[in-house]
Amino acid sequence: IPLSVNCWLDKGQIPGKYPTGGPVAKLMPVWKYAATSIDIYGPDIYIPAFLSTCDQYVKDGNPLYIAECATHSYAGIRELYVIGHYHGMCYSPFGFEDIGQPFTMMQGMLFGMDTSDELLKTPQNPEEYARINRYLTGLMPLLGAAYGSKRLQASISENGNEETLSFQAYDFKIAYESRFLSTKSGACLVLKMDANNFYVIVKDCAIAIKSTQDMLPYTDFLSVEEGHFEENGFVMERRLNGDEITTMAFEGVHLLKIKLFSYR
């Protein structure tokens, strides 16, 4: 059984003012040297610097294992990014049963309500979070098979207004600013099944897909289906066409099954 340890992060306080001595990023080499039986080191992330903290904890082959994190409005999109980008082993918002409830004063301090970012002050929408996790649960066997490969990638608005995910024959340009979107906070997870087939979980973003093939420079959709997973696989709820696939802008959380082709 793998042995893991998670820790309270340094928030700039004097050692002793918080639970000190754990495997914070700067002390991980010491822990790895002295505690060789520990397999996984994980951060409890309540600080606003979420992505840079994750980057620090995936060094030297350490898998990303987030045993605790906040339940503010970044919780859902960060879960998509942890799985799609870092191929994380664990993502566990603390006080899961209270998602969506107003923060107490203590939670507010832990979750970063002393910042100017409104999303850090706002509880995660529980319906949105449930939908994200239903889609991830349905995809789980396929996601696990893609861990450690470039077939599984993700984008998040915390990286900027635009981001490009490259999959050999296609580039997926993800945008979080659009006249079709009412928010600038979102994420996108893309799972490549084969050269032309993809599963995509979108949350408040727009997608533009381009061919990277010089001999086949143009791209179009053979099909774009929205749906969910059941025991026997993907179940289509509706097929998108017309203006829906011209704009490819999505508000809320959706699971898409996309089939592409390239031509000249």
What is the predicted function of each stretch?
Residues 1-7, 194, 198, 210:
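Extended amphipathic secondary-structure runs
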Residues 1-26, 42-43, 62-74:
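Aromatic-lined carbohydrate-recognition surfaces of secreted/lumenal glycan-active proteins
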Residues 4, 92, 201:
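Residues in well-ordered beta-strands of folded domains
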Residues 9-11, 97, 206:
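Short loop/turn segments at secondary-structure transitions that flank enzyme active sites
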Residues 14, 102, 209-210:
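Short helix/loop capping segments that flank catalytic or ligand/cofactor-binding pockets
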Residues 29-131:
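Catalytic-core region of carbohydrate-active enzymes that cleave or remodel glycosidic bonds
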Residues 115-191, 195-205:
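A conserved mid-domain beta-alpha-beta active-site/ligand-binding segment of alpha/beta enzyme cores
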Residues 173-182, 196-264:
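C-terminal beta-sandwich/jelly-roll accessory domains of carbohydrate-active enzymes
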